[in-house]
């Protein structure tokens, strides 16, 4: 079949030029049914949201009718203007990482299934091809070298038919004789310096005054590396050297932890595991190098489409093989799940490599074995923690932690995952003094990346496990100990920064301690075990507060009105099952009186209408440099952002909502005022009494004010277009733990918005308006106020808290854990769509159950990197493991209607982990200091 496109949607407009290669973006791929006129689906969808609440997900109809097509499903024949011929690629990978690679042999394949091209490291060297710099080198392993990691790519094989590809793959995959290895060597990672090292030191000052020392106040300091281990500065109370002074306070704290008799110190070491994200769809790529048109067409499945979009040209521009490529068209379809597994991966770059050599469109698609071997994993953490309490007051007096993080074989966000994990260790507690060290080391394991939780699952679970044990040692109720130590509004985090807003931790704890399962846990244990002599009963609790955002969020959105009054919303976020299209499409109803008729996700090129550019890393840019660049109204610290870090509900909402607000304030309300003035008021004789925009309200019939007739959106849109008013608003924002704001002059009025870029599109009646090639007019900001670069040292200030109470039974004979019930408390801020929040709670809890009880990958040659792992060996939690019929939750209501929505996609996964570990202790009287706690561990303990 072919894929018809509305021609207006296929006008690929120039985005940017990288090394002479012009990068374009195509709209979201759609099934051919969408091309039918008078599509009944559109009539059904017209009622998808009423009274500002969605009746079903925006993409629900496509889901149930089979029209939601994922990138993995597209073949060349489905793509407009592509040849019908589809080629296929197979990647050969190393399954050993401690022997010299000598070569590979596929001569045993019959001639009719031999690849027509074998791409090796020699081809890369001859054609100057490599990965982008941030992934490191060695795109393909050279002969005579030891693999950098298990699963390293050796060669790419190209086949001209699926039959040949499939037969060849069946004979190559799992065949240990294909790749030859020589002498044994040391693991390559052992000779590399750490990927990153962080040290977070704080010494609180007098109440209400500045800290004696903190990361926010005094800045970060870093070690030297000697024999691949960090060597930190000498300790010295020197005002001239923040590193030495930081070490002075770290040393003081360590001495107190070791020697103070009035402190109780819990000293424990925790180990977490390597985990496979298990996204619904493994990664895939399809690409066609149209040599006649000098254009490379690409279909990717990525959470970070914009990152790939801006970097693909760099790979191509370097290579003489691709010197004829002048254009790259990037298609960004739906992706089947993410969890961080498809954020910032290098998979698509191997697709580009294949496309450069292929004779036709070529597809690379991991099967589940290959995804296990290649895909990003969750970082394993080893944490040696010392948590000190005052024996009398039960208040925390200090925290010392030494974390070692396994960063895998290729660097991928490992530095920031390590930093975020370290900064999250404090959980929901106020800690007056801390020395937290976190070092991320390369290893032979498959590369680890930004999997859901981003380091916080590992560190906060350990903190909660410590609190549960400390409560027992101090002979105090676990929730009471938490209430004593809960961080309160205005208190500082371990970096010395004040978290934004009211944390509401104590409120959540008070709700949990009143739950019947908690109140009756002792009597319930006696009754249950008497009734079930073969089982043990336990209840556990955990509470955490997860940051959301990256400290350099840069969302973009646009909201447009057609002449008929249809609303079109476009965002940079990728829909990967979380319902971003539903929430973003619905939230505009606040200002426009109706939800969106069309929502387009993963938009990239069109946002270049704002003509923005960036220059420096937003994390290390100096204040002087930021001040200098801010004078250019086209400059921003960051142009684009990935769909990650629980970004959509808070960050993406900012630009979507502001675009709708501007459209309402500058177009819809003025248009309505003119109609009311001319038709329903003696405007020539008196001043209207309906000029206060705050009094305007949307009703079912339209926009009304102070008793004047409602005017429907279609009428207002028609007038706006005929009069050449603003009918489309595009916005960009930047957030470094606070929003940038800027002044813009729109329609002659100067106003400050929490944005740093605006562009507008005017209606069909507009005359003599200069627009750029995208049809937009950039509204240059008059001034801008970016958050100070020092806020980078805060590491995080936005938090969303979540608590979970878990009730379990343990079968004595088998060690099997049965979840009887769970209750989750979540403070999500303003809820955009409750059903989507509920889905996150259920899905997050399931993933947490997997981390706590089931999911595990060995970190040596027996693990995922050897290519033999799949769901036949890897246990993910199923419905029977989750207690699905007793999975309950409470959403804390917002403090007011002005509360922002919070990013909760990750936090909902975390507290169930320590809750389950504690429940196992309460059942078995055995504490565990690792995850997962599997049935065999429990049997051994019993």
Positions of the model-derived regions?
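Thiamine diphosphate
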Residues: 336-359, 363-367, 373, 382, ...
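Phosphate/diphosphate-binding loops
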Residues: 160, 360-405, 653-679
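Short acidic, glycine/serine/threonine-rich loops at helix termini
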Residues: 129-133, 168-171, 309-311, 339-345, ...
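N-terminal export leaders
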Residues: 9-17, 23
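Helix-loop-helix junctions that connect adjacent transmembrane helices in secondary transporters/permeases
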Residues: 203-318, 486-564, 790, 804, ...
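C-terminal catalytic domains of large/alpha subunits in multi-subunit enzymes
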Residues: 122, 319-326, 357-361, 419-531, ...
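N-terminal secretory signal peptides
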Residues: 1-11, 32-37
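Flexible, low-hydrophobicity surface segments
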Residues: 34-217
């Amino acid at each position: 079949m072919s894929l018809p496109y509305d021609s207006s949607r296929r006008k690929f407009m120039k985005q940017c030029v990288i090394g002479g290669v012009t990068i374009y973006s195509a709209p979201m791929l759609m099934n051919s049914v969408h091309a039918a006129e008078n599509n009944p689906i559109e009539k059904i969808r017209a009622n998808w949201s009423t009274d500002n609440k969605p009746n079903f997900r925006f993409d629900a109809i496509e889901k149930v009718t089979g029209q939601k097509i994922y990138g993995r499903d597209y073949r060349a024949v489905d793509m407009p203007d592509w040849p019908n011929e589809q080629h296929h690629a197979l990647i050969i990978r190393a399954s050993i990482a401690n022997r010299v690679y000598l070569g590979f042999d596929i001569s045993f394949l019959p001639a009719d299934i031999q690849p027509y091209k074998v791409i090796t490291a020699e081809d890369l060297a001859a054609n100057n091809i490599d990965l982008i710099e941030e992934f490191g080198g060695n795109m393909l392993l050279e002969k005579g070298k030891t693999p950098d990691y298990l699963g390293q790519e050796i060669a790419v094989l190209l086949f001209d038919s699926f039959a040949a590809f499939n037969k060849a793959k069946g004979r190559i995959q799992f065949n240990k004789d294909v790749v030859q290895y020589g002498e044994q060597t040391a693991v390559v990672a052992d000779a590399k310096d750490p990927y990153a090292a962080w040290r977070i030191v704080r010494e609180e000052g007098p109440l209400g005054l500045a800290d004696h020392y903190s990361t926010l106040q005094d800045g970060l300091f870093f070690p030297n590396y000697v024999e691949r281990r960090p060597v930190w500065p000498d300790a010295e109370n020197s005002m001239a050297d923040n590193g030495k002074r930081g070490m002075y306070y770290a040393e003081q704290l360590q001495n107190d932890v070791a020697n103070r008799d009035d402190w109780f110190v819990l000293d424990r070491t925790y180990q977490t595991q390597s985990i496979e994200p298990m996204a619904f769809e493994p990664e895939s790529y399809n690409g066609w190098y149209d040599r006649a048109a000098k254009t490379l067409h690409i279909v990717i499945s990525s959470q970070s489409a914009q990152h790939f979009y801006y970097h693909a040209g760099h790979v191509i521009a370097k290579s003489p093989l691709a010197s004829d490529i002048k254009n790259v068209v990037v298609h960004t379809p739906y992706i089947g799940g993410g969890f961080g597994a498809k954020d910032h991966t290098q998979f698509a770059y191997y697709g580009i490599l294949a496309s450069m050599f292929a004779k036709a469109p070529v597809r690379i698609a991991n099967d589940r074995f290959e995804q296990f071997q290649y895909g990003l994993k969750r970082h394993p953490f080893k944490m040696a923690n010392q948590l000190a309490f005052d024996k009398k007051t039960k208040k925390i007096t200090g925290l010392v932690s030494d974390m070692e993080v396994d960063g895998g074989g290729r660097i991928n966000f490992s530095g920031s995952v390590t930093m975020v994990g370290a900064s999250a260790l404090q959980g929901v507690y106020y800690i007056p003094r801390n020395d937290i060290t976190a070092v991320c080391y390369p290893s032979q394991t498959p590369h680890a990346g930004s999997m859901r939780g981003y380091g916080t699952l590992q560190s906060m679970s350990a903190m909660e496990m410590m609190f549960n044990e400390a409560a027992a040692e101090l002979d105090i109720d676990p929730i009471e100990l938490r209430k004593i130590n809960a961080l309160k509004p205005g208190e500082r985090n371990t970096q010395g920064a004040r978290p934004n807003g009211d944390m509401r931790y104590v409120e959540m704890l008070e709700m949990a301690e009143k739950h019947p399962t908690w109140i009756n846990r002792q009597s319930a244990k006696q009754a249950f075990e008497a009734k079930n002599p073969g089982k043990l009963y336990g209840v556990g609790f955990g509470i955490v507060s997860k940051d959301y955002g990256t400290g350099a969020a840069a969302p973009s959105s646009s909201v447009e009105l057609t002449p008929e009054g249809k609303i079109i919303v476009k965002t940079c976020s990728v829909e990967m099952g979380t319902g971003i299209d539903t929430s973003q499409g619905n939230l505009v109803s606040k200002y426009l009186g109706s939800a969106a008729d069309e929502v387009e996700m993963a938009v990239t090129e069109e946002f270049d209408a704002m003509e923005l550019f960036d220059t420096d890393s937003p994390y290390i840019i100096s204040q002087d440099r930021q001040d200098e660049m801010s004078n250019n109204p086209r400059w921003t610290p960051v142009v684009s952002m990935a769909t990650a870090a629980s970004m959509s509900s808070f960050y993406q909402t900012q630009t979507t909502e502001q675009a709708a607000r501007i459209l309402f304030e500058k177009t819809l309300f003025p248009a309505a005022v003119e109609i009311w003035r001319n038709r329903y008021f003696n405007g020539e004789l008196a001043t209207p009494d309906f000029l206060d925009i705050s009094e305007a309200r949307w009703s079912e019939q339209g926009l009304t004010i102070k008793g004047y007739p409602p005017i429907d959106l279609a009428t207002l849109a028609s007038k706006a277009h005929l009069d050449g008013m603003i009918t489309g608003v595009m916005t960009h924002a930047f957030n470094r733990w606070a929003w940038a704001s800027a002044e813009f002059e729109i329609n002659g009025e100067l106003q400050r918005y929490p944005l740093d870029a605006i562009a507008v599109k005017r209606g069909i009646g507009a005359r003599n308006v200069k627009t750029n090639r995208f049809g937009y007019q950039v509204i240059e900001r008059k001034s801008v106020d970016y958050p100070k670069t020092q806020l980078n040292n805060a590491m995080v200030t936005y938090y969303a808290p979540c608590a979970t109470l878990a009730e379990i039974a343990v079968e004595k004979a088998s060690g099997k854990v049965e979840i009887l019930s769970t209750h989750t408390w979540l403070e999500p801020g303003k809820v955009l769509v409750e059903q989507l929040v509920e889905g996150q709670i259920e899905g997050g809890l399931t993933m947490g159950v997997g981390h706590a009880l089931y999911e595990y990958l060995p970190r040596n040659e027996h693990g995922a990197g050897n290519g033999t792992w799949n769901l036949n060996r890897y246990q993910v939690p199923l419905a029977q493991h989750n207690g699905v019929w007793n999975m309950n939750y409470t959403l804390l209501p917002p403090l007011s209607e002005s509360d922002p929505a919070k990013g909760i996609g990750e936090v909902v996964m975390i507290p169930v982990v320590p809750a389950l570990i504690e429940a196992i202790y309460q059942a078995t009287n055995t504490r565990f200091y690792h995850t997962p706690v599997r049935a065999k561990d429990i049997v051994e303990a019993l």
